[in-house]
C-alpha cells in the first residue's frame, strides 16, 4: 500500500488518511489478482480495493476526469455503471489532482514528489513546459526517473499493451507514465474497445484502455453540459459492449485520474492584472486550480505573504516542507517552486502573460483539494 496520508491542517480539504487506498495502488492491486508474484503486485492493495484473485489477465480502464462524485451525480445517464453502483469504491487521487500527476502515479505507484510530474505545466529553462507534451524539454525517462509498472513487467518478460489514440504514442506523458507497454493506436471508443478485446483474445496479460473525451468535454464546455453528458453516455454504452464481449478469466478494473468542477469566472484572479500578485514573481506555472509560484531571488517570504493577503480564504497556500507532505517525498517540491496555491470554492488563479485565452476561459477544471476533484472511483467490473 502507498504511504499517502497527509497530516497538514488545511480546513475543507479532502485528503487521504493513514491506510486509505490511493490511485497509486490500483495497478498493484490489479496485478495481484492475476499473479501476486508479478513485479509491483500487492495483495494488500488488492484486498483494500475489493479485487479478488484467480484471474488470468488484467484489463485496466482509466476514464480521464470522471471523478467519483460525478458518477454519483450523473448516474441517471449511465445504465451500465448504475448496475454496479453499489460496488464503486471512492478512493483518493494524488495532489495536484491533474492528469500528468495522476496518470503517472497510476503508472508508477509513486506520488508526484518522486516522479516530478507535479502539474499541467512547470517552470523549465526560463519558461514554462507542458508536462503532457514535454516539447523542448528532457526525455520523459530523464524528467520522470521512476520505473513504471509496465517497464517492470517487461523486464520479467510479461507483455502489456496501452490502447489509446495514435497522437498519444510519443507524448511526454505516455513516456513518463506508461513506458514499457506496447502502444496500440485506436481512435474512436468503438475502435478502442475492439482493440482491447483483440489484445485480450490474443493473450496479452495486461491491457490498459484510456478514454480522455469526458475530460476534454468538461474543459471545453463544462461538467453537465450537453457535450459532457453525450460523451459520458457514449462511454457507458461502449463499456457495456466491452463487458458483453470479454473473454473468460479477465479481471477488469475501472478508475479515473481526477474529478472536475465548473469554475465561476468572476472568481478567477489574473496575476498579470493584479500588481500585488505580480510583483516579485519570476514565473507562474501549474494550472488554474494548482498554481506554482516562483519568486524572485530573496523575495519568497514577502511574495507569499502578499499572496496570502490578496487571496485570503479563496485558496490554500502551502510552502516549504508542507509541499512534500502533500505531493510526496522527492524532488517534486523543488520543481513546484516557492509555494503552491490550491484554489478553494470555484475560483482559481491564472496568468494571461503565459496562458492562452482559451486555457483561461475553460469552464471545467481540476487540480485542487476539494472532494469533487480528489475523489476517484475504483470498480471491479469482471
Model feature map: region roles:
Residues 1-382:
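Feature captures the catalytic ectodomains and active-site-proximal regions of enzymes
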